[in-house]
Design a protein with these regions (language model features):
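Re-entrant/interfacial helical elements at transmembrane boundaries that shape
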Residues: 42-52, 65, 80-100, 131, ...
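Membrane-embedded alpha-helical segments of transport systems
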Residues: 70-75, 116-128, 136, 180, ...
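Membrane-interface alpha-helices at helix entry/exit sites of multi-pass transporters
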Residues: 59-63, 100-117, 289-301, 329-332, ...
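Short helix-coil transition sites and intra-membrane helix breaks within transmembrane domains
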Residues: 34-43, 81-92, 124-128, 265-275, ...
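Transmembrane alpha-helix interface/packing and boundary motifs in multi-pass membrane proteins
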Residues: 28-42, 71-84, 159-164, 260-269, ...
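A structural-propensity feature for long, helix-poor, extended segments
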Residues: 69-80, 87, 298-323, 327, ...
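Membrane-embedded alpha-helical modules
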Residues: 112-228, 340-494
Length: 504
């Protein structure tokens, strides 16, 4: 325990360098800008900036990505409040009361509430990182090859299923990702697989290129296709922004309840902020003493939604960092960033790389304070970003996609791979398939394969080794549950969203 406290303290010392502080400010600002642009997502923003972190120290690069993540989740509330168009699915419930407050001349108050609630939801969720992540990491140290295989299968079944609207489509997306993960040289005997004579595929598909293509370039195609539809412009506002002491006192119980809800949802693989925001909103409505205000601009509704969706951020990092199971698309991209940096998500992050991990944790805490400061000071300015035309947005994102993919190895083949995955992502979204499931399978596929083949090599080919330990059986049961859980999750999500199912 004492050693952990010392590592926490050292983490804050390392996080408070000028480089890391600048990374927090820049990441939060960029995240808010991305989040408040309807059509862009936190996952897309993190994927887009991933190549730029290659030249940074590992902890600084992760802090930048974490800052973009937090900033984008809050940024989605800006357009949700001002133009009734959530910048990200995580702010869908915020639009219900937030836009009504705008119509009532309280846009500034709504934005201040969203920012204040986001800060506390995110800050409280950081406590989970400190208290639960190290404990789970110690448990993960007991995982051998067979357990790692079933852990990968568990992650694939839950994420590929729950993150899609149907079991079949979710599993199809996951299967496609597994197929793509097989491209390149066999990790055991070096046999060529699906390379078709192309030497640049020897190391497999570059995860960063796939991320940029699936999340960013595909969105460019979507925006270009919808260019003929003019987006509603953000409304101006002039009311006072600051929350009163009485309002903060009234909102505190809502913040605490939404933090608990969002944290639990974040830890569960396959769930996400889009579900948490509606659960937080519904909970705020159920416990409110002024239920008649809901639907007409209830400040508690904005608070409940934003505190819950930002509480997801800290919780969602726990399964990714400790078990290597990214719970949603954003943490899948962050996991890709770890892999690219040569770091394997799991218990080693808390032993061999403890200094880097706790620096990232400390940075994640400090990011919440920068988000509060920048959000409060820049509400009026960020609101104008929502007014940007797609004619400006599309070419800017396109240039970033090309530059980002080329910068990885300074090779045009990476640009080609990015474009191919961009087209693939566009087609998948047109056919309502989940792009996040492809990325998760692309990352988890090699982990499962190495676990399976490693276990079989040790046992001399005896399949019984896969069923020998109690941990394996626990993961098998969880995997079976994961396959069928989308049915229950879909019914639950339909209930909390009033019939509208949202995707990350």
């Amino acid at each position: 325990m004492l050693e952990t406290l010392q590592q926490m303290g050292q983490g804050f010392i390392h996080a408070l360098t000028w480089l890391n502080l600048l990374a927090m400010v820049g990441g939060v600002t960029l995240g808010i800008v991305i989040g408040c642009l309807p059509g862009l997502s936190a996952a897309m923003g993190v994927a887009l900036m991933l190549p730029l972190t290659f030249t940074m120290p590992t902890d600084t690069g992760l802090i930048v990505l974490g800052a973009i993540y937090c900033g984008a989740i809050f940024g989605g509330s800006i357009s949700a409040i001002l133009i009734h168009t959530p910048g990200t699915p995580a702010s869908a419930a915020t639009a219900i009361e937030g836009y009504q407050m705008t119509l009532n001349g309280q846009a500034g108050k709504a934005l201040a509430t969203a920012c204040w609630s986001s800060f506390w939801g995110g800050l409280l969720s950081c406590t989970s990182l400190y208290f639960f992540a190290p404990a789970l990491a110690q448990l993960a140290l007991k995982f051998m090859s067979a357990e790692k295989f079933w852990l990968g299968i568990f992650g694939l079944t839950i994420i590929a299923g729950v993150s899609s609207k149907s079991i079949i489509k979710g599993l199809m997306s996951g299967a496609l990702g597994l197929l793509v993960s097989c491209i390149g040289l066999d990790p055991i005997d070096g046999t060529q697989r699906f390379m078709f004579g192309q030497a640049f595929l020897a190391e497999g598909i570059n995860v960063t290129c796939a991320l940029i293509g699936l999340f960013s370039m595909s969105q460019v195609f979507i925006l270009a296709e919808k260019k003929i539809v003019e987006r509603e412009k953000a409304k101006k506002f002039s009311d006072k922004i600051a929350l009163t002491k009485a309002e903060k006192k009234m909102l505190w119980p809502t913040v605490i309840r939404s933090w608990i809800i969002g944290n639990i949802i974040g830890i569960l693989p396959g769930a996400g902020a889009s579900i948490a925001c509606f659960m937080g909103y519904n909970n705020a409505k159920q416990f409110s003493k002024h239920k008649e205000d809901f639907g007409h601009g209830a400040i508690e509704g904005v608070c409940g939604s934003e505190a819950a969706n930002n509480a997801v951020t800290g919780g969602s990092l726990i399964p990714m960092l400790t078990l290597g199971i990214p719970g949603e698309s954003v943490t899948a991209v962050l996991m890709g960033g770890l892999v690219i940096q040569g770091l394997a998500p799991g218990p080693e992050l808390f032993t061999k790389h403890a200094a880097m991990t706790y620096t990232f944790f400390a940075g994640f805490v400090l990011v919440q304070f920068f988000m509060l400061t920048i959000g409060m000071l820049g509400c009026r300015g960020f609101a104008q970003i929502s007014r940007l035309s797609d004619a400006i947005l599309i070419p800017c994102v396109t240039v970033l996609c090309f530059v980002g993919s080329y910068a990885i190895h300074k090779n045009l083949s990476d640009v080609v791979v990015m474009l191919i995955f961009g087209v693939l992502g566009y087609l998948m979204r047109k056919f309502d398939l989940n792009t996040a499931a492809v990325v998760l399978a692309l990352i988890l596929g090699p982990i499962s394969e190495k676990g399976l083949r490693g276990a079989l090599r040790v046992s001399g080919g005896d399949l019984g080794c896969l069923f020998a330990s109690p941990v394996s059986w626990v993961l098998i049961v969880l995997s079976v549950i994961g396959i069928f859980s989308p049915i229950l999750m879909a019914k639950f999500e339909k209930k909390v969203t009033g019939g509208e199912v949202l995707e990350e």
